[in-house]
Design a protein with these regions (language model features):
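Short helix-boundary/capping micro-motifs
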Residues: 12-30
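A short LG(V/I)-centered, amphipathic sequence patch enriched
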Residues: 42-61
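Alpha-helical linker/hinge and terminal dimerization helices associated
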Residues: 44-45, 66-88
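Central regulatory/effector-binding core of bacterial HTH transcription factors
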Residues: 92-155, 224
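A late-sequence structural motif
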Residues: 107, 258-302
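Hydrophobic hinge/microswitch elements
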Residues: 130-135, 139-142, 149, 203-259
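Flexible hinge/capping segments at coil-to-helix
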Residues: 157-195
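Secondary-structure junction motif
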Residues: 193-214, 281-285, 289, 298-302
Length: 303
């Protein structure tokens, strides 16, 4: 069966944005042409790919299957086109990175700023994911690499490199100031409201294991989707939370938050680079990866 690649390209954008009009705008085309192309694609493949409504489109199971195959190819073709137009001086190019919110906040944003200052012509595509989702994006070929926080599970074929260790601290709002002069243990935390990330997060798994190792049970009163949400909830006096020290430090210094001390030592975690060493990177991505790994090596030497 021969199907024009242009149809698959259009399908990728329609599926990505779940909207014919928006896909047409991105492709510099018009909505009737996009609709016609997708009708032709469905006819040639002899299946329905979209469920159409006034609010846009959703993928059918057949559409989901096709998108899972097309997405990786589309991203790699985009990268190939952009790399061919790049110069040796990195005046043009693109980097796609999947990252966790914590990794972005306490590590990656600073590295991106330095890189963008030196190479302003390089386009950056940053996607915010949980650690498992970020690793999956690398495995699927949807991004050049991922910057994640441990714990992380990496399968064969992918490589993980530690870039920077970090520590977390137990913090609370001003109403918990009296506790700051005490030393608590994990079992005693059951008597105080605790804020954690949701059940599916690797951070939640990390702390669940940490509590179990000390014969305590993690029972949060409030669950949040992101560390930024946790920080907002802590500042709103809704409870205590384990936060990355670099994120909490400014608020601890200003007195907006207080640090609580534990008898148990919270294990350190790491910011890590995850990439597929079987898949070559474009010039810009390779340059940025080298910058990250060199910085990580210097960090390891200072330990």
């Amino acid at each position: 069966m021969y199907v024009d690649w242009e149809y698959y390209k259009i399908f990728y954008y329609v599926a990505k944005y779940q909207n014919f009009t928006r896909a047409a705008r991105v492709l510099g085309n018009n909505q009737p042409n996009i609709t016609h192309a997708m009708n032709r694609l469905e006819s040639q493949l002899n299946c329905v790919l979209f469920i159409r409504s006034n609010r846009g489109v959703t993928l059918t199971p057949e559409g989901e299957l096709l998108y899972s195959r097309i997405a990786s190819a589309a991203v790699q073709i985009q990268d190939a086109e952009e790399e061919l137009s790049a110069t040796a001086t990195l005046e043009h190019g693109a980097i796609s990175i999947s990252t966790t919110e914590t990794a972005l906040n306490i590590y990656l944003s600073e590295k991106l700023r330095a890189f963008h200052t030196e190479y302003p012509g390089i386009r950056l595509r940053i996607s915010n994911h949980s650690t498992p989702q970020a690793v999956q994006a690398v495995r699927n070929g949807e991004v050049d690499f991922a910057i994640v926080t441990t714990p992380a599970e990496v399968e064969n074929g992918l490589k993980m490199v530690e870039l920077m260790p970090f520590y977390e601290v137990l913090v609370g709002g001003k109403t918990f100031t009296a506790l700051a002069s005490q030393t608590l243990n994990l079992k005693e935390l059951a008597g105080y409201p605790l804020i954690c990330l949701n059940e599916e997060s690797m951070t939640r798994s990390f702390y669940r294991q940490f509590f179990l190792e000390h014969d305590a049970v993690l029972k949060p009163d409030t669950e949040a989707a992101t560390t930024d949400q946790m920080l907002t909830l802590v500042k709103s006096e809704l409870g205590l939370a384990f936060m990355p020290e670099p994120m909490a430090a400014p608020l601890l210094t200003s007195g907006e938050l207080v640090q609580l001390h534990l008898q148990e030592i919270i294990p350190s975690r790491s910011i890590c680079l995850v990439y597929d060493h079987h898949r070559p990177l474009n010039t810009a991505a390779r340059k940025f990866q080298q910058l990250l790994t060199k910085a990580g090596a210097r960090s390891a030497e200072r330990k």
